Each structure stands twice: as C-alpha cells, then as structure tokens.
Amino acid sequence: LTLEQGKPVKEAAGEVHGAAGLFDYFAEEAKRAQGRVLVRPTGQRSIVIKQPVGPVAAFSPWNFPLFLMARKLAPALAAGCSIICKPPEETPACCMALMRCVLDAGVPGHVAQMVFGVPDQVSTHLIASPIIRKISFTGSVPVGKHLMKLAADGVKRTTMELGGHAPVLVFDDCDLDRTLDIIVPQKFRNAGQVCVSPTRFYVQNGIYDRFVDEFTKRTEQLTVGNGLEDATEMGPLANERRPEAVGALIADAADKGARITTGGDVLGESGFFFRPTVIADVPLDAQIMANEPFGPVAMMRPLATLDEAIEQANRLPYGLAAFAFTEMAVRR
C-alpha cells in the first residue's frame, strides 16, 4: 500500500486493520438483515422482505484503496450480492491482494471478481450490462455525475460518495492547543487526499492571527518523505497530475490576494512530494475556496460571528464533513 500509494506505513497499517474490521462488522450485520411485519390500522399485515439487489459493479479510488474497496466488497457479500470490482489505476496490487484474501477465505470466484483496464471503457461496459443491477462509486463529482447518467439508461440503483470541501469553524473560546493537536494531523493525513479532510478554516477574529501563526509553525515541523521511513509524517501525492493541480489552485489564490505563510510548492526534484501549505486571508472568489484541493493545503479566513460562520460553512453545496471547535455546546 505504501509503495503504490505513498502514505506513511503507519497510516497504511491503520488502513489495513480498518479494512479487516469492515469484514468483521458486515459479517455480523448479515445476521440482522431481517424483514419486518407492519400492522395497518385496518388490521392488515404487510410483510417487508429484504432481498439481494443483484450483481454490483464497484468503483473505488486511490486515496484509501483497501478500506474503500472493502467497504464495497463486504456489504455486498453480506447482503448476498455478487460483485465486480474496478480498482484504481494507481493501486492495482494492493487491491488485488485484498481480492486474493477474499477468494482464499472461500468466496467463489464467480461471486467476487476484479477487472482492470481503461476506466471509461470498463465503467461503460459494466454499467450498460443487463447483468449489473447496482453501481457503487467513490470519487470525484464530475465522474460521479457521468456514471449516474450511464446508470440512468438502465434505471439502475447507485450509491455514491463524491467530493467534499469540509469547513472548520474555530471560535475564540476554544482550547487552542488542543484544537491544533487535533486538526493539524487531521489536515495533513494522507497528504490531504481525504474526502473528509478539513480544508476551509474559518477562525474567529479574537484568535485568528495566533491560530494562523501556530498552525503554520506546526505545519513547518512536519516530516515529509518516504512513507517506508518511520519518521515520515506525510508522503507524496498519488500521481504526477496532483502537484500541478494543487499548485495551480494555490497560485490562483495568491494572485487574488491570499497570503502563503508556508509551503506552496513542490518538494525536491523527483517524485510527487508537495510542501505542506497554509494560506491565510484567502478571498472567497479564489478557486480553492470552491474547488476541493485534495492535497496538503489549509485555507484560513477570519470570521466575526456565529451567523457568519454558519453562512460561510454552508456557502458550498457539499456535505460529507464539517468541524467545529468551541467550549460551548450551545451558541447563540
């Protein structure tokens, strides 16, 4: 996993254990796939029966290839569905190792399968097949929309987890050190290539400057390097396209007045390493405030009131995750 995707081996170990835990969970959940009897006011009884939907086509991403593949494989098998998995191009070997574990555990080869190939060709063929009855996809919003259109032709069920752009609300009554202890590692986990990664930081005026300074100091202390080395806290980005894409968003923000307090460029002359980056005073019209960077970039903006915080957090049509740090359980 580390060799293919780049994340530190400590994070990779956590992903492996997490993937195994999913199989344990859904193995137990299979016992609870029971129907219900509904009694109507007229005395009639309706029986609800849960049945397998049928063969599933599952498409998983490269950021958590084992965990997210397991999150599709395990529930499908527990529900009694066969499944064909299309792994990401960047991480074929670790996904194949997972499938080998499934087959070695006794799942028949005609029940769980894996296919490799050009993504668009594979997805078009599988989704158009009358055999496939459900599609599961984790990835970007544009690709998700494309797959939904393909699925619509066959009126097929879809389950999708698409992009996010998680807001972080930091109020001036928070325990600042504890907040930083939590949020800095969370931001740079897997080099920021996490769909629920904290990205848009809205910090109350009273602690804004201090928060930016302390966040920047901690960011500069991160060890970036080979994921196989024990000291490494952040590895490279996943492929050659990512550094350029992240750099373009940062450059656009800087051109529009944002202040880069640390990072902002590639690290080293080889590989896909990108320096952990903090950008302060980011204007709302910067592309990075609307487009998920999916990289090691934290964007900071000051805020004055709770109403402003809620407004800014909800200004984008993305859900998936949000963070808030305060000592008050109820604010108003």
Task: For the regions a language model picked out, list residue spans one by one.
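N-terminal Rossmann-like NAD(P)+-binding subdomain of aldehyde/semialdehyde dehydrogenases
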Residues: L1-Q44
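A structural signal for short, well-ordered beta-strand elements
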Residues: Q5, D172, N239, M299-A304, ...
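Rossmann-like NAD(P) dinucleotide-binding subdomain of oxidoreductase/dehydrogenase enzymes
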Residues: G35-R178, L303
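ALDH superfamily catalytic-core signature
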Residues: G106, K134, P142-P283, L306-D307, ...
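Conserved glycine-rich beta-strand-loop-beta hairpin in the small C-terminal domain of fold type I
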Residues: T232-E233, G271-F274, N291-V297, L316-L320
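Bilobed periplasmic-binding protein-like "clamshell/Venus-flytrap" ligand-binding domains
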Residues: K256-T262, Y318-T326
